[in-house]
A protein has these predicted regions:
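C-terminal accessory helical subdomains adjacent to catalytic cores in phosphodiester-
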Residues: 2-4, 18, 22-58, 62-248
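Catalytic nucleophile-elbow at a beta strand-turn-alpha helix junction centered on a G-D-S/GDSL motif
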Residues: 8-20
Length: 248
């Protein structure tokens, strides 16, 4: 029998792992799969700031592979230890039409609503949306990454409009401390409640397959609405932990 493989989740920050780590570990364990590992890149690698405005969308694949290699080297693991790679990303309303990015001179950053984003820097936010949505579309059509000449199954999961909105129904601007508080609360509630966790993922999931979930979030203002395709992502993994659970 070969060595046990694990799923690597590439996430933006520590609160992603704090919120989802125990719940996902319990879910994987229910199907007798090893718990997932988390590689934290500390920032949105689909953004302009991470890759540069002039880089093509395909650059995101190279950045992802670099992040995987860094994680494996740090933990002294091999590519052959990977069962699959999952990128978890916030949508940040990136797929909305430019007309829904509204000027507000009193808003130094941006405020998110279900039907618009308000900001004092419209041009910059529209550019961010164009770059981020292009890269996410590329990833939604990517089904494997090549790392050290080995092809590893890949899926992209999204939280809409962000982790706090999707998991905790918190739609306002939150401080870093608030993010940690929400993540701890979520972990405490769902960390060992596999059925409850799956019920939430089912509630957040759009109708249809993994690919359908990306068609949905790219339509209209859906990337501003609360939702996630984590359920479809987990179902699409080679060793799906969801398929091992008999009931939802």
């Amino acid at each position: 029998m070969g060595a046990t493989k694990f799923v690597l989740f590439i996430v933006e920050g520590e609160t992603d792992e704090l919120a989802l780590g125990r719940a996902l570990t319990s879910l994987f364990a229910s199907g007798e799969h090893p718990g997932p590992r988390f590689g934290i890149v500390r920032g949105d690698i689909t953004s302009v700031h991470a890759l540069g405005a002039g880089n093509p969308a395909s650059t995101i694949k190279r950045r992802l592979v670099d992040a995987v290699k860094e994680f494996l080297a740090k933990d002294k693991l091999r590519v052959t230890d990977l069962d699959a790679i999952v990128l978890l990303s916030d949508t940040d309303g990136a797929f909305i039409d430019d007309s829904l990015v509204i000027f507000d001179e009193d808003e130094p950053r941006c405020s998110y609503f279900e039907d618009r984003i308000e900001t004092s820097n419209v041009a910059s936010l529209r550019q961010r949306n164009q770059c981020k949505s292009s890269r996410l579309k590329t990833l939604s059509r990517t089904h494997e990454l090549t790392c050290n000449k080995r092809k590893i199954p890949f899926k992209a999961a999204y939280m809409s409009r962000n982790l706090e909105h999707a998991l905790s129904d918190c739609s306002g601007r939150v401080t870093q401390q608030k993010k940690y508080d929400l993540a701890r609360k979520f972990s405490k509630k769902y960390g060992t409640d596999v059925i409850g966790f799956l019920e939430l993922l089912t509630f957040l999931a759009p109708v249809g397959s993994y690919q359908d979930s990306w068609v949905y979030v790219a339509r209209d203002n859906n990337s501003l609405l609360r939702g996630s395709n984590m359920k479809q992502t987990l179902e699409a993994l080679p060793s799906s932990p969801i398929k091992a659970v008999s009931s939802l």
